[in-house]
Every structure is written in C-alpha cells, then in structure tokens.
UniProtKB/Swiss-Prot annotation:
It is found in: Synapse; Cytoplasm. The RING-type zinc finger domain is required for E3 ligase activity. Widely expressed, including in the heart, skeletal muscle and liver and, at lower levels, in the brain, colon, small intestine, placenta and lung. Down-regulated in ovarian serous papillary tumors. Interacts with NLGN1 and EFNB2. Interacts with UBE2D2 and with MUSK via the first PDZ domain. It comes from Homo sapiens (Human). Residues 249-339, 419-503 form the PDZ domain. SMART domains: PDZ, RING. This is E3 ubiquitin-protein ligase PDZRN3.
C-alpha cells in the first residue's frame, strides 16, 4: 500500500501516484507493458488475476515484474510529516529519513513497564509516570509473612491478601517453568540433531580413511608386482647380450649330509620343450661356512650345467633336486659363471639419500627389497621400515647386465603427470620428502620419492605419493642428483613447484565407491572367517590323526620323511631365518633326537607350494622349520585351568554320540556325576550356568557361520587380489609339495614371495608369509574336510563332495613326532576340476574311511593334549606370522564356538553338497538415500513370488467359512508376521531366562540366611514321606521311583513301613 497524500508537505506529482490505491507509490514495480504500481498492490492482483491491472495484455506472472529504482529514489526525496503528527509531533523530514525519526520520536506511544500497569503514554512521559504516578510501582515488601513485593496502590489501600498474591506468584512461576521446559526440549532436540550430524561426519571421515588405506594398499600391491618382475630379471638375466661367461668345474663334499646352497629355475615341466631364455638351474643362496661357501666353491647366480656328468642345462627343478640327492661323493659340478664387463665404474661405497628434514643412506638393494615387503592388513596402515644396512654377499656386477631391456619397457608405460605446489612459511620448515636415486653408472638417472613424513607439508597436501618420480623442480628439469639436492635444500625458496610422474593405474576402483560400506563389513567378517578356518583346521588335524591311529596299514609320506636327513635334500637347508644363522644339518640332528624322545614336541614342518599366474615364473626352493624346543604346554596362550574348564564344558554339550549317525549331543561322564552330586546346591547352579553359556555360544556360532556364508557369496570376487610372485619349491624330498599347489597367498601377507610356510628371507629378521584363507573357503566347505556319515564313508572319494567344493586345506598331525602336514585339496581329488597350473601334482597315498562318530572321542583328548596351548614362545619363532597367528588363538570360547559350529554343520553333510545358488544383481537403497548394487539369490525372489501366488489362489478358493478355515488349509504367515513371531519368541526366552536366574538367586539368598544344616536330597525325601506317617504310605507328591529308591523311612533311619509294591508292565 502507498503513502497517504495528506502526509506530504506540498503537492505531489500525479505520475507518482498508484493507479490501484491512488496513493503515493511505495516500493514501485513496473509491468512489461509499462504501468507502475505499488508492490503491496500489484503482487496480490497478479497472483490472483494473472494479468496486468490495466487489462492491456494477456497472462502476467509475478516473475515478470521489475523494480523502478530511479522512481523510488525520487519518491524518497519528498518531504513528509511525522506519523505521530496527531499526537503532537510537528516535524517534517525526507521520506528516506522517516524510519530513523520514528525510532527516537518523543511523541511515539510507549507502555508502562511495571507489571500490572497497562497504561499507554508518550515516550517522553514514561519515565516520570513509572517514577511518580504509577500505582503498580513497588514500594517495599509485605511484612505479613508472604515477603512478596508490595505496590503503591496496595499500600494506599491498606495492604493485600497474601494467600491470593502467593497463588498468583506461584502460577507465574509455573508458567515460566513450563516455558523453560519447552525451550529445553527444543534445545535438546537441536543438540541431538547436531550430534547425529557430527557423528555421521566422523563416520564418513573414518570410512574415507579406510577406503584411502585400501586404495594405497592396492597401489602398493601393484608396485610390488612390478618390482617382482624386475627381481625375476635379476635372478635370471636374459641371454643374447654378449655377456662374458666362463665355465668352471667344482668339486663339492657333503658336510653332515648337506651341501649348503639353494637353487632356483628349471623348465616348468618335462613335456615343455619350448625353451625360453630364463631356463636353467641357478644358485640363489649360499649358507655361510657351508661346503659350497668354501674357497673355490659356488657363487650366487652360477648356472649349473652338469652334476657328476648328468646334464642339467634343460632339466626341470625336480630333476635337478633328484640329481643332487642321488649324486655320490665327490660331487663334480660344472657351472657357468658370469664375469663383470671390462669397463670403468665406481663401486657404490656410499649411496646418497636427500631429505629436506633428515638424511639416510639407501641402496639399490633396498629398492629391490621392496618386492618382498608385505603390505599392511586393512584397515590399519602400519608403516614399514627399510633396513639400515644390507651387506653384499658377492662381488659387484653391472646392474644393466641383469635388468636388460627393462628401462625401454618402462618407457613404454603410460605416465600420469601432476604439478604440485608446496609452500612453507619460513626456511626452517621441512617439506618432508625423502628422495632416492641410483649412484652407479646406469641409464636411469631419475629422482624418486621413497618416503613422506606424515606430519610434513607434503603429507598435509596429500597429492604426492611414495614412488613418484620428480621431473621438474620450480620449472627446472632435474638432470642429475646434484641439481635435485641443490633445489630441494635451497633456503631461499619458500615455494616449490614439483612436476611429478607416476604410472597410470589400471585398477578399477568404481566398485569401492558403489559398495564400500558392505565391503568394509566384509573385511571384518573375513577376519572372523579366517579365525574359524584356523580352528577348523585344528579339528581336521585331530580327525586325520585319529584315522591314522586306527588305520595301521596307511602311512603318510610326510611322516616317513619327518625324522630323516633328506629334509635338506642333500643340497642343504639354507634358510637361516629360524635358526639364527646356525648350521641346518646340526639342527636337523637335534630335532630328530628331540622328536624321538618327546613325541609331543617334535618337529613341526609346514611346506606348501604355490601356483602363480605367470607361466614364466621361476620356481624357488627353500625350507623352514619351527624349533623343537617348545612343548605342548607352551604353544598357545591359554591358562591350564581355562583349558580344563572349557574341556569339561565341551564334554557336557558338544560331544558327539558315537552310536548316533546324526551326531546328537549328550552329556559326558565326569559332569554327569557332578550333576547328581548331592553335596552342594552351588555345584548344580554352576553347572546349570555353564550349560546355559554353552547353549548361547552354540547359537552364536551357528548365526555367525550363516552370516559369513552369505557374505562369502556376495563378495566372492571382491577380495581376490592378483598374486604375481615366484613359484617356490623345496629342494628337499618333499613328495607332498605338489599336493598343495592350489594354496594361494596374498602378496600383502608375504615378506618374501615364497610359498613355503616360512619365508626365504635374506636374513632372520624378515617377516614371513602366511597362508591365505580365501573367502571361497566357507565354513560349509571347510567342514566337508571332516568325515561325516555318507554312503561311501570315505574322505578321499570325490563322490562325497559336490561340485561346489573349491579349495579345502586340512592339516594332519602325526601322533609320533607331532608334525603337522597338509592333505591335498579337493581340487586335486576332483578329476572334473580344471587345473590352472602346469605343475604336476603327486597323489596322496592311500586313504581310509573315517566315520563321523569318531569326532567327539578324537576331539576332546586332542584338545586336552594339543601342542598349541600355552604361549611360551621362543624368541626366534616370534618372527613368523603363520606361527604367531596360531599363537593368537587365545580365547577358548572362540575355539569352542568353532567346534560346535563344525559339529552342527556336519549333520547336513551326509547328502551331496548342493550346487551354488544362482544369483542376480539388485539395486539397494541405504538409509541416507544412496544406492548400491549387490548380489541376492534368485531363490528369494522365486519364494516371494510363490508366496504371493499362493496367497492369491487361497483367497479366491471358496466362500465357505468351513472350507477356508485354518484347521483345513493352514495359515500363510507373511514375512513381517514371521519376524514378529521371532521377536516374541526371543522375548519369551529372555523372560524364561530371567525368571530362572531370579529363582536361582532367591534360592542362594535363602540358603545363605538359613543357619541350619543343609539336608541332602535323601533327607528331604524322607522328611516329605514321613509327614503323614500314621495316615498313609503314599501321598499326592510321592513317585514310584522315590519309594523304590528310599523306602519308607523315618528321620532316625528306622524302617516304619514295608508295604508290598506291585508293578505291572503293559
């Protein structure tokens, strides 16, 4: 609405008037047709009518109206009277100054601020009124007892009613309290929303951190794979480059049956005649002070041509091992040794490393050692440390002779360039970049980033990664190390512009953004599944041991070799990682002696081989042993009393009845006797609590096994990483070596790419590898390794397993020497299963059937005398992850859960394993509205459709109430109703448990308060029977069993009645 015309001083131009309200324009708006109206007038009109008020055009919307600023400024310069002119104000001001005048005008209306006085006065008269004339002004406090303020009007009237005043005051306080409560609730609601928002942000940040960790782990895995290819070229240099080689003939003699060196290489198989440049048998390692390390002996990288006249130039790895094993002394070995090129070079006495904060020496051997570094387990990133020193065990060779055309191959890789700007506040701040470079005369003179300080400027920037190559610094192309050192250590520059290059990653990381929440859940479940697999491997070892005890004619090949010197293959056990650089053969003798004297503390040897994806990978050979000085009492960190307690608990609930093919539970003998012991009620209560606890553990284990089965089906492909390591074989007579070729290992879990149970480390400080427990090895498949009742009754037959069986790893333990060995996987036993490796696989001897009723009797004694029990860990054994992971099974509760889960699943294995369910992709919606894709069984959709179809059919069958009754047709329960039933059942079970616990607590309190002597069951029964001794023998509460057991006795023990009891059996 506009301004009134009579308020303006003087005449107003008609063009400044609104055509709707006929007043002076207030905030004028113009239409597209040129008419001008007040904003308060034209907006309601356009919204309601949808046209111009002048009816000059068609449809009009509010968006088409525009402000007329020049006209508005012209109107604001008009003189206008004060709005309170009627109250006595005679001021005339400019329209644009009117709001400021109204705020301080003395004639503006104002209300008295005293409570109870609502008089409206002029602003200039309010203060005088409140001070002198207001009847509601306070003049003191009531002296009659209420103590409330007394107003001037009440004092003039002679006082006030205290009760009425107190009630009014109380009502005012309650109203204020209610307002405060309401405000408090609003603030609490606002704070709760804020807290949820912050928690969500924190969770998102943690999730992003975990995803970043996984992303860098994948990148590190790719770098390790690329460096593996370099190390393979170093181990087997390509020919055809005109290297200088010379042929040498050496004579070796065994020292205690050992030659003291390792070999690698050989043709992949006997049938493969496509010779490649990497064929040949090479010396990979030489033991210090061994026969091969003497003067005039072998050297690393020597190629073995003949052994005692037997040509090994085109032999396989197994043929070379057999040749050294069967060779008679003296052993004449002909080798080809490469000599350095005749050119000038500077030996790398000291390699350079430049860091703007610290300086550390780093050599080419450190870079090559990165191929053996293990990546951290998700989601925790443990930084690895480069070793401080790495002594060279052989003379210097030109690296270009070994690497060959690797630089040209790397040049062909696609590079990703990125420019990074780093700023520091002063010259004392450190960039935190540790760069490394080669100091020998090679072609690659690049500068690489090897480490980033986590608290530095570069780490906070986040764009620079380890392994990046620095191309330019501040626009200057880096040509050599001197330029890089000068530019990075310059104190004048505070701004650094780095141009870095890195290979483009070929990994598809889109799945991580789409399904990262479910994938992180799978990480945790995968760790739990790994623990379950390890527990089930223990159970499998117990069953295999029991089978071996009962099958006298069957002998394990690994058992025959467990106490012989052929473990070192005649070539020598050259891995010093478990013996701290001591002689391998002497320790073998000591192990044999210990094993013969202490069967439970014998040698424990784990040997496995690996199939790699590359057919040109060279096989390595090595062995590792666990010391024989740890007995069964110091192997797993569980106290003796805890083991005994849970052993009894498992005997109570988890033992399998031998005569029952379905494996039903039944209580064992020792605890049955304890249950019937009448000496103490506390004993019965304790046994009852343990029984309830065991039932709860059983339920938890079944639920966990079911969840892991579902997760395994959903994320089958998500956790399988490419493994590009060496195939590793033992040079010992390990005939079980080929039976484990499908045991894969994750690159991030192995410090040396070797598939023996422990690493082929260059020193005893290296971290060993551990076996991968793949998500494909579900609990259901792992349970198939345990003999269950079937029509065949045998373990080794493929008919007992379905086609869904994939990779099953079982461990057997020899009862004489306690040597755990591996039995072959089902992939080898199944003739229909395709083999992915060219390596030949040996069969696993004869097998005998093991019935499932042996599970309970075999499990309990073995668990009691298990060699994996207490944590007295030798110092040299603490370096092995595979050893330590067995040690870390500290909780007997988890062990009991695994066993009970196994027993419960064995019931269903008598029938053939069903094939894998068909899956389909489903789009799911999270609570935050984001979408993700996951796999779901087709069976769920079919069942849902079938349920709907049944419901439709039944709803239209007939109108006869009797025909559609639940007694005849049954009732269909929907999914929601079934969920409600489960909730009710859980609530009822919880109430029953609570009532039982309350009753037991009440009994305990009554017994504690009762000072009389506790009577046993017999005395209570006698007392009950003799209450009515003179009336009748039987009462309503006596049973026939009580009468037969106790007779009719008085409390003093004398027999009162001797009635005749006749029992008729129908």
């Amino acid at each position: 609405m506009g301004f009134e015309l009579d308020r303006f001083d003087g005449d107003v131009d008609p063009d400044l008037k609104c055509a709707l309200c006929h007043k002076v324009l207030e905030d004028p708006l113009t239409t597209p047709c040129g008419h001008v109206f007040c904003a308060g007038c034209v907006l309601p009109w356009v919204v309601q009518e949808g046209s111009c008020p002048a009816r000059c055009r068609g449809r009009l919307s509010a968006k088409e109206l525009n402000h007329v600023l020049p006209l508005k400024r012209l109107i604001l310069k008009l003189d206008i009277k004060c709005a309170y002119a009627t109250r006595g104000c005679g001021r005339v001001v400019k329209l644009q100054q009117l709001p400021e005048h109204l705020e301080r005008c003395d004639f503006a209306p104002a209300r008295c601020r005293h409570a109870g006085c609502g008089q409206v006065l002029l602003r200039r008269d309010v203060e005088a009124h409140m001070r002198d004339a207001c009847d509601a002004r306070p003049v003191g406090r009531c002296q009659e007892g209420c103590g409330l303020p007394l107003t001037h009007g009440e004092q003039r009237a002679g006082g006030h009613c205290c009760a009425r005043a107190l009630r009014a005051h109380n009502g005012a306080l309650q109203a204020r309290l209610g307002a405060l409560h309401k405000a408090l609730k609003k603030e609490a609601l606002r704070a709760g929303k804020r807290e949820k928002s912050l928690v969500a942000q924190l969770a998102a940040a943690q999730l992003e951190l975990q995803m970043t960790a996984l992303r860098y782990q994948k990148k590190f895995t790719e770098y390790s794979a690329r460096l593996d290819s370099l190390s393979r070229c170093v181990a087997a240099p390509p020919g055809g480059k005109g290297e200088e080689t010379k042929s040498l003939t050496l004579v070796l003699h065994r020292d205690s049956g050992s030659l003291g060196f390792n070999i690698i290489g050989g043709r992949p198989s006997v049938d493969n005649h496509d010779g490649s440049s990497s064929e040949g048998i090479f010396v990979s390692k030489i033991v210090d002070s061994g026969p091969a390390a003497k003067e005039g002996g072998l050297q690393i990288h020597d190629r073995i041509i003949e052994v005692n006249g037997r040509d090994l130039s085109r032999a396989t790895h197994d043929q070379a091992v057999e040749a050294f094993k069967t060779a008679k002394e003296p052993i004449v070995v002909q080798v080809l040794r490469r000599t350095p090129r005749t050119k000038m070079f500077t030996p790398p006495s000291e390699s350079q490393l430049v860091d703007t904060g610290t300086q550390t020496d780093i050599t080419f051997e450190h870079i090559m050692a990165l191929t053996k570094m293990s990546s951290p387990s998700p989601p925790v990133l443990d930084p690895y440390l480069l070793p401080e020193e790495h002594p060279s065990a052989h003379e210097y060779y030109d690296p270009n002779d070994y690497i060959g055309d690797i630089h040209q191959e790397m040049d062909r890789e696609e590079l990703e360039l990125e420019e990074v700007d780093l700023y520091r506040m002063n010259s004392q701040d450190k960039l935190g970049l540790t760069v490394c470079y080669r100091t020998d005369d090679e072609d690659d003179i690049g500068i690489y980033i090897s480490e980033i300080d986590p608290n530095s400027i570069a780490a906070k920037d986040g764009r620079i990664r380890e392994g990046d190559r620095i191309i330019q610094i501040n626009g200057i192309e880096v040509q050599n190390r001197e330029e890089a050192v000068a530019l990075l250590t310059s104190e004048e520059n505070k701004n650094f512009s780095l141009l870095i290059a890195r290979p483009e990653l070929q990994l598809d990381e889109g799945w991580m953004d789409d399904d990262r929440n479910d994938f992180l859940d799978d990480l945790h479940m995968d760790m739990l599944e790994e623990q379950h697999h390890q527990a089930m491997q223990f159970t499998a070892s117990v069953l295999q041991q029991k089978k071996h005890d009962e099958d006298g004619g069957t002998t394990d090949t690994a058992t025959i070799l467990s106490n012989q010197h052929e473990k070192d293959s005649g070539v020598g056990r050259t891995d010093e990682s478990t013996r701290n650089d001591e002689s391998s053969e002497q320790e073998n003798n000591g192990d044999d002696a210990t094993a013969s004297s202490n069967p439970l503390a014998g040698q424990r040897k784990l040997t496995c081989s690996q199939d790699t994806l590359g057919s040109g990978d060279l096989p390595f050979s090595n062995e590792s042993f666990i010391s024989a000085d740890c007995t069964d009492a110091d192997y797993l960190g569980i106290p003796v009393d805890e083991c005994e307690r849970f052993r009894e608990l498992l005997e109570l609930k988890c033992q399998v009845k031998s005569a029952t093919p379905y494996g039903l539970y039944y209580p064992s003998g020792p605890l049955d006797a304890g249950k019937s012991d009448p000496e103490s009620v506390d004993k019965e209560l304790e046994l009852l609590n343990e029984e309830l606890r065991s039932i709860e553990l059983e339920c938890l284990s079944i639920v966990r096994a079911h969840k892991m089965q579902q997760l395994k089906e959903q994320y089958r492909e998500s956790w399988m990483l490419h493994n590009s390591g060496f195939r590793n074989y033992n040079t010992s007579i390990d005939v079980r070596r080929h039976e484990l070729s499908d045991i894969t290992e994750l690159p991030e879990k192995s410090d040396k790419d070797s598939s023996s149970a422990y690493n082929t480390g260059e020193s005893c400080r290296s971290t060993p590898l551990t076996l991968e427990i793949s998500p494909d090895n579900s609990l259901r498949r792992a349970a198939e390794g345990i003999s269950c009742p079937s029509s065949e009754g045998a373990v080794g037959t493929t008919e007992a397993y379905g086609p869904a069986s994939k990779n099953l790893l079982s461990i057997t333990e020899d009862p004489e020497v306690g040597t755990p060995t591996y039995s072959p996987s089902l992939k080898e036993l199944d003739p229909n299963q395709p083999l992915e490796s060219k390596e030949r696989r040996a069969s696993d001897g004869s097998r005998s059937p093991t019935p499932s009723q042996k599970l309970g009797s075999a499990y309990l004694p073995s668990y009691h005398h298990s060699p994996y029990k207490h944590a007295h860990i030798p110092a040299h054994a603490q370096h092995y992850q595979s050893y330590m992971q067995l040690i870390q099974q500290k909780s007997a509760v988890e062990y009991a859960q695994s066993q009970m889960s196994l027993v419960s699943m064995c019931k269903d294995l008598s029938s053939p394993t069903p094939s894998e369910p068909r899956m389909e992709w489903k789009v799911k919606i999270r609570s935050d509205g984001t979408r993700y894709i996951t796999k779901r069984p087709v069976r769920d959709r079919l069942l849902r459709e079938r349920a709907l179809k049944i419901r439709e059919e039944r709803s239209g069958m007939t109108t006869d109430d009797d025909a559609v009754s639940e007694m005849k047709m049954g009732r269909y329960w929907s999914k929601e109703e079934r969920k409600q039933h489960l909730v009710k059942a859980k609530e009822q079970r919880r109430r029953r448990e609570f009532m039982m616990q309350s009753r037991l607590d009440c009994l305990k309190e009554q017994q504690a308060a009762d000072d009389r002597k506790e009577m046993n069951i017999l005395e209570l029964s006698h007392k009950k029977m003799m209450k009515k001794r003179n009336k009748k023998i039987f009462d309503n509460w006596m049973t026939i069993q009580e009468l037969l057991t106790h007779g009719t006795k008085s409390p003093d023990g004398t027999r009162v009645y001797n009635s005749f009891l006749s029992v008729t059996t129908v």
